[in-house]
UniProtKB/Swiss-Prot annotation:
Name used for this protein in its record: UDP-N-acetylmuramyl-tripeptide synthetase
Lineage, uppermost ranks: Bacteria, Pseudomonadati, Spirochaetota, Spirochaetia, Spirochaetales
Pfam families noted in UniProt: Mur_ligase, Mur_ligase_C, Mur_ligase_M
Sequence positions bearing N6-carboxylysine: 232
Transmembrane spans: none
Keyword Cell membrane set for record: no
Length: 505
């Protein structure tokens, strides 16, 4: 896809541009913020960052073939045959999003984009919507923390460390969906992605939105819970007024604000019969859940191969969304719930014939802990052993809450690394331990920063009937330290620990 630079610039907000130095009569072939990804004819956006400054990589970008540099700081030297566009520091990400959107011919306007937001459950809801739409024969694509599908029909693992990619990648991916004939695009819309500070999603046109819940998360980025809430409300406010709608969890404290943010909405609840869709009964088993719900006075009976009432919430959100966008009979969607399966790293049960149970889950917020731990305790026929940590350089206040919740339900707790980043591992662990008051260190509470060693210790302590839960990483393929990332595969580490234990017997 090639464009004339001037043709793109003419469609952008000229107030964002401080000056242009060089020719506008250039052909551009791509957009990126990574000098490593630059190809001949690419526009390079020199983004300022926390650890790295894109301005330090301008020379490399030019060497790799970039002919247009978008920057926000004064240059000491201007290379000939390269065009420089200067914008303000605070608007460079907005400009990058605007530019990418226009370069790729505003792809979201050619799709019906469904945004899913909330603290917990986003990835699962996206995946369930995706599976149900595919089962209905609809051409669908999606972008989530775990998987991508550009409409080619094959799932690929999210290659980026953040849940929501940068705007250059978002619009490129949406453009591929258009080329592949996608009708509906499901987009996991995180608070980071929705925030104007990152501007990753500001040029996406949303047809419908789903709200799962609000909990204690990302306050290190947003500052206050109100800021965090407002960012998510922005998604609902942006939904198309004509045919668009929202799907809202009525059980959440902030549900009324989301209802007020969108013209048309459908609510679901596990507690209130005032919801449009009311779940009146849930019967949980270790590998499946049966539930009943009402809609417009009609009672429906449903069964899913998933564990937990939280998954009933996620399934209801997906069911409502799909039934409404396709104007389908509710029973028809209920019948297709058997196609739903869990995501990688979500309630993964590891069974290699051992006499105890092991579950891996991505849960890493107090909200997720409060939903999962009662379920874990209920299904542990003997002791509950918990292995988890908390992210470094992220919301510090949640650490105490994670410790407090785990303390109530767990018999043994092993604290370890999640992603310490630039923080000291033991400091993070001790922050979590402040919430743990009913355990004794080195008796039923262990501080083991090395996650592999912590998992191996937990497996070695497990007895017949115990349930070991390993939380916080799930599908993630690395552990982030200050100056390095270490490859990680939670499932393999757990399996190897179990196999090693069996060999010792």
């Amino acid at each position: 896809m090639n464009k004339k630079l001037n043709d793109v610039l003419l469609k952008l907000d000229q107030d964002l541009i401080k000056y242009v130095k060089g020719s506008l009569d250039l052909e551009i072939s791509g957009v990126t913020y990574s000098s490593k990804l630059v190809l001949p004819g690419f526009v390079f956006f020199a983004l300022p960052g926390i650890r790295f400054d894109g301005h330090d990589f301008i020379e490399m970008a030019i060497q790799n073939g970039s002919n247009v540099i978008v920057h926000s700081r004064d240059m000491d030297f201007y290379s000939p045959n390269v065009t420089y566009i200067k914008v303000d520091d605070f608007s460079i990400r907005k400009f990058m999003s605007n530019f990418s959107n226009v370069f790729y011919d505003e792809p979201s306007k050619k799709l019906k984009v469904i945004g899913v937001t909330g603290t917990d459950g986003k990835s699962s809801v996206c995946y369930y919507i995706y599976l149900l739409l595919k089962k209905k024969g609809v051409k669908v694509g999606f972008i989530s923390t775990v998987f991508f599908d550009d409409g080619s029909g094959s799932l690929i693992k999210n290659p980026y460390r953040q849940s929501t990619p940068e705007s250059t990648e978002i619009h490129a991916f949406l453009s591929n969906m258009v080329k592949n004939g996608v009708q509906y695009a499901i987009l996991e819309s995180t608070s980071h992605g929705l925030d104007l500070k990152t501007a990753r999603l500001i040029d996406v046109n949303y047809f419908a939105a789903v709200f799962t819940n609000i909990g204690h998360e990302h306050l290190e980025f947003h500052g206050t819970i109100q800021n965090y809430l407002n960012v998510k409300l922005g998604l609902f406010r942006s939904v198309s007024d004509d045919a668009g709608f929202g799907v809202i969890n009525l059980d959440d404290f902030y549900s009324s604000e989301f209802k007020n943010a969108v013209k048309k909405s459908f609510t679901y609840s596990l507690k209130s019969s005032q919801a449009d869709f009311f779940v009146s009964f849930i019967d949980e088993k270790i590998d499946s859940t049966r539930f009943e719900f009402y809609y417009k006075g009609v009672k429906y009976f449903a069964n899913v191969n998933l564990l937990g009432s939280f998954n009933v919430e996620n399934v209801m959100a997906a069911l409502i969304l799909v039934s409404q966008i396709l104007n389908s009979d509710i029973q028809d969607i209920v019948d297709k719930l058997v196609c739903i399966k869990s995501l990688d790293g979500r309630m993964d049960s590891i069974n290699l014939g051992q006499n105890f149970s092991v579950i891996i889950d991505y849960a890493h917020t107090p909200g997720a802990f409060s939903k999962l731990f009662p379920i874990f305790k209920r299904f542990a026929t003997n002791r509950l052993i918990s292995v988890f940590g908390s992210a470094g350089e992220r919301d510090v206040a949640k650490r105490f809450l994670q410790g407090q919740i785990s303390d109530i339900y767990s018999d043994l707790i092993l604290l370890c690394d999640e992603d310490p980043r630039g923080e000291n591992s033991m400091c993070i662990i001790k922050d979590i331990a402040k919430g743990i008051v009913n355990k004794v260190v080195n008796q039923d509470l262990f501080f083991i920063p090395d996650r592999k060693q912590a998992i191996e210790k937990a497996i070695s302590l497990a007895r017949a009937g115990d349930l070991v839960v390993v939380l916080g990483k799930g599908h993630e393929s690395s552990i982030i330290y200050k100056n390095r990332e270490v490859f990680w595969n939670e499932q393999e580490v757990v399996k190897n620990a179990i196999l090693s234990l069996e060999k010792e017997k």
